[in-house]
């Protein structure tokens, strides 16, 4: 018994296949999905979706969205996503360092749209690095 997982972004189908287990980065924490899971809708945060299939794990960097679980079908609708295997780890690390520098420059400043954007960039860069490094 397995799950059918579809990860869909506005411009592409990122993943469409079978999975033995899915771990979603929900806004309330990690959410594990196994075959036979109860139906649910969940808001997703920026983070890494993990897929166990064919005896190994795949990672997908998600940039927020929603997940629907219905019987053994999992549909993930996201703003943007990248397979970890398609992310250049060294480039992602450079982006992460640049985002950290930008956030640190804004330490102590009052809340602003620029500060929020810098934090969001840091979260996205962190997710990309984690997805690139967590390929089995």
Swiss-Prot record:
**Any keyword Secreted?**
no
Supply the Pfam families for this chain.
Answer: ATP-synt_DE (PF00401), ATP-synt_DE_N (PF02823)
Which InterPro entries does the record associate with it?
ATP_synth_F1_dsu/esu, ATP_synth_F1_dsu/esu_N, ATP_synth_F1_esu_C, ATPsynth_dsu/esu_N
What is the protein's membrane topology class?
Peripheral membrane protein
Q: Return the GO cellular component terms, semicolon-separated.
A: plasma membrane-derived thylakoid membrane; proton-transporting ATP synthase complex
Q: Which SUPFAM superfamilies match?
A: Epsilon subunit of F1F0-ATP synthase N-terminal domain
Q: Where is it localised?
A: Cellular thylakoid membrane
Which segments carry the region annotation Disordered?
88-136
- The domain of life for this entry's organism is Bacteria
Gene Ontology molecular function, alphabetical? ATP binding; proton-transporting ATP synthase activity, rotational mechanism
Asked if the Swiss-Prot or TrEMBL record annotates the protein with the keyword Transcription, the reply is: no
The secretion signal range is none
Q: Which UniProt keywords apply?
A: ATP synthesis, CF(1), Hydrogen ion transport, Ion transport, Membrane, Thylakoid, Transport
Broad class of the protein's primary localization: membrane
Q: Which PANTHER family match?
A: ATP SYNTHASE DELTA/EPSILON CHAIN, ATP SYNTHASE EPSILON CHAIN, CHLOROPLASTIC
What role does this protein play? Produces ATP from ADP in the presence of a proton gradient across the membrane.
Q: How does it assemble?
A: F-type ATPases have 2 components, CF(1) - the catalytic core - and CF(0) - the membrane proton channel. CF(1) has five subunits: alpha(3), beta(3), gamma(1), delta(1), epsilon(1). CF(0) has three main subunits: a, b and c.
Q: Which family does it belong to?
A: Belongs to the ATPase epsilon chain family.
From the Swiss-Prot or TrEMBL record, give the protein name: ATP synthase epsilon chain
What is the originating organism of this protein? Synechococcus sp. (strain WH7803)
User: Could you tell me the gene encoding this protein?
Assistant: atpC
């Amino acid at each position: 018994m397995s799950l059918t997982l579809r990860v869909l972004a506005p411009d592409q189908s990122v993943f469409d296949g079978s999975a033995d287990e899915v771990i979603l980065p929900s806004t309330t924490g990690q959410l594990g999905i196994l075959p036979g899971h109860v139906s649910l809708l969940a808001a997703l945060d920026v983070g890494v979706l993990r897929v166990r299939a064919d005896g190994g794990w795949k990672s997908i960097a998600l940039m927020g969205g929603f997940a629907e679980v219905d019987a053994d079908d999992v549909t993930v609708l996201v703003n943007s996503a990248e397979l970890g295997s398609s992310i250049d780890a060294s480039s992602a690390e450079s982006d992460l360092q640049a985002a950290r520098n930008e956030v640190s420059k804004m330490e102590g400043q009052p809340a602003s749209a620029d500060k929020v954007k810098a934090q969001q960039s840091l979260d996205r860069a962190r997710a990309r690095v984690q997805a690139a490094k967590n390929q089995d």
